[in-house]
């Protein structure tokens, strides 16, 4: 599973993707380690769905209590926005903007995803049999509502819970630059950035 910060291109041949990777290669180390100095938090996980998939979606943090263990502090020369504990002025949307701007210096971005989003796809529907009737759809929606109520009560803003309801982007590892047929776990990693 993954959260896409930036899709550079889609529906291209292997040769076209190879050319994009070659053009971007000098910028990839900076792109993948951007989260080391530009830290943002995602909070309030919820299950969401549309006609093709179900996902866990997050919101950019905006002042909620930091629940994660302390991260490696930044040295003064590395500090861009500090740690998540210093505030949420720098959000995931700022990170997406900065990744876009840095990548755009090397290649033209031709992404399918134009709306800012922070979601991890959990699964895609193979068919609509499970949603074929109003009763099936009502049962599906009720199950998602029940999970979301549990998340809000047991995970959001719970400092000592079994699960932590936030994600500091880049904690443990930086961004993962990948190429190839990436849907459903395909493709390969070019480089993974430094975590904290």
Residue ranges of model-derived segments:
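Histidine-dependent nucleotide/RNA phosphoesterase domain, centered on the 2H-phosphoesterase fold
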Residues: 1-196
């Amino acid at each position: 599973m993954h959260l896409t910060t930036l899709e550079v291109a889609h529906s291209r041949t292997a040769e076209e993707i190879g050319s994009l990777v070659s053009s971007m290669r000098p910028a990839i180390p900076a792109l993948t380690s951007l989260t080391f100095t530009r830290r943002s938090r995602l909070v309030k996980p919820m299950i969401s769905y549309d006609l093709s998939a179900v996902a866990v979606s997050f919101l950019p943090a905006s002042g909620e209590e930091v629940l994660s263990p302390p991260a490696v502090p930044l040295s003064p020369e590395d500090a861009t926005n500090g740690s998540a504990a210093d505030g949420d002025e720098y959000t995931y949307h700022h990170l997406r903007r900065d990744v876009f701007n840095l990548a755009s210096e090397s290649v033209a971005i031709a992404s399918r995803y134009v709306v800012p989003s922070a979601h991890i796809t959990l699964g895609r529907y193979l068919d609509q049999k499970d949603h074929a009737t109003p009763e099936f759809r009502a049962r599906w929606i009720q199950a998602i509502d029940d999970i979301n109520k549990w998340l809000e009560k047991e995970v959001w803003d719970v400092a000592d819970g079994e699960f932590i309801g936030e994600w500091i982007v880049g904690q443990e590892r930086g961004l993962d630059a990948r190429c190839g047929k990436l849907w459903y776990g395909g493709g390969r990693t070019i480089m993974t950035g430094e975590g904290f």
